[in-house]
């Protein structure tokens, strides 16, 4: 059965009316909480088959998409288009969190992915997918990204004391900024304001974004000449992943969490993932697995030659003050 929980009430396939959460049947349940949404999903079963687990994964994906769409709708209807984001930048409502990325062999931190968050004074935490899509639709992704750069530069002295020399700073770049006239100058300015010779900036670009731009190869060559590295983000979720590997010079493949989440299930994921890893090695590209949440996933990925791991098994994204005190709680690398 399925139950959707909102505070103390639940809508369940086991009843035609709203029931109290305490009245739900007591049995084995898988629970998924949609982040930043006051909604909990429970999937009930006495035993879980591989087909049921795949169904649960698919159902959770649908719920996640629906929640993101709902947040985007609320954001676009309740807020004055454009004005709120610019006002939020001016009032300091955006902040940065850092998620560690570790070397798969030694389990030592080698860098971070930098992620932006928005705490609205009345709506609370707004999901990143919602406000980023909103900013792209309103042609505000460039000022939003420049504000992200400012926040990173502000944090850089502390990051320099925490991260080793050569540490990777993974930054997501939207297509609206990637092909803006100011992009090259923006990147040069950002690089010049970072502590010299300490960080290696990795620009994370989804394959869906590259599909629309024939000039991508020339731009990527320029970025490499300027000292930046490039990662294909969410690899395997777009339309022409293998074509990009053939035509563009990349440094990293970030394996989408959808592949990682199905490790251990009886699906075709393992052979597909094996093929991706083999291809990356032949192309001299490093691999980063996103969404690593369990020791079993980490073990499988390490045994199959993934270079870097990122996910809740290592750490959730953290604000700067929490990140500077963070100590990894991971097993010895030999385990």
Where are these regions (language model features)?
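Active-site core of bacterial EAL-family cyclic-dinucleotide phosphodiesterase domains
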Residues: 80-133, 315-318
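Catalytic core of bacterial c-di-GMP phosphodiesterases, primarily the EAL and HD-GYP domains
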Residues: 140-215, 291
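EAL-family c-di-GMP phosphodiesterase catalytic domain
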Residues: 41-54, 175-179, 202-212, 228-229, ...
């Amino acid at each position: 059965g399925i139950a959707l929980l909102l505070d103390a009430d639940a809508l369940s396939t086991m009843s035609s009316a709203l029931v109290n959460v305490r009245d739900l049947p007591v049995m084995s349940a898988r629970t998924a909480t949609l982040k930043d949404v006051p909604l909990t999903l429970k999937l009930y079963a006495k035993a879980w088959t591989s087909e049921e687990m795949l169904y649960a994964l698919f159902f959770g994906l649908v719920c996640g998409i629906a929640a993101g769409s709902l947040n985007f709708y609320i954001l676009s209807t309740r807020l004055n288009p454009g004005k709120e984001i610019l006002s939020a930048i001016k009032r300091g409502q955006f902040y940065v969190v850092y998620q560690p990325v570790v070397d798969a062999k030694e389990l030592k931190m080698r860098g971070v992915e930098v992620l932006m968050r928005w705490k609205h004074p009345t709506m609370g935490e707004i999901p990143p997918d919602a406000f980023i899509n909103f900013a792209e639709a309103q042609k505000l992704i460039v000022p939003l990204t420049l504000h992200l750069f400012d926040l990173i530069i502000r944090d850089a002295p502390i990051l320099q004391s925490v991260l080793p020399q050569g540490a990777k700073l993974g930054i997501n770049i939207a297509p609206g900024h990637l092909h803006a006239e100011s992009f090259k100058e923006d990147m040069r300015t950002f690089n010049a304001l970072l502590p010299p010779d300490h960080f290696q900036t990795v620009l994370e670009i989804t394959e869906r974004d590259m599909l629309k731009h024939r000039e991508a190869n020339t731009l990527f060559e320029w970025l490499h000449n300027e000292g930046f590295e490039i990662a294909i983000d969410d690899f395997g979720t777009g339309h022409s992943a293998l074509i990009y590997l053939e035509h563009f010079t990349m440094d990293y493949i970030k394996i989408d969490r959808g592949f990682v989440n199905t490790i251990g299930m009886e699906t075709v994921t393992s052979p597909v993932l094996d093929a991706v890893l083999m291809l990356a090695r032949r192309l001299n590209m490093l691999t980063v697995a996103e969404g690593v949440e369990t020791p079993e996933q980490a073990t499988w990925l390490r045994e199959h030659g993934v270079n870097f791991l990122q996910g809740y098994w290592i750490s959730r994204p953290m604000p700067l003050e929490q990140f500077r005190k963070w100590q990894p709680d991971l097993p010895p690398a030999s385990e």
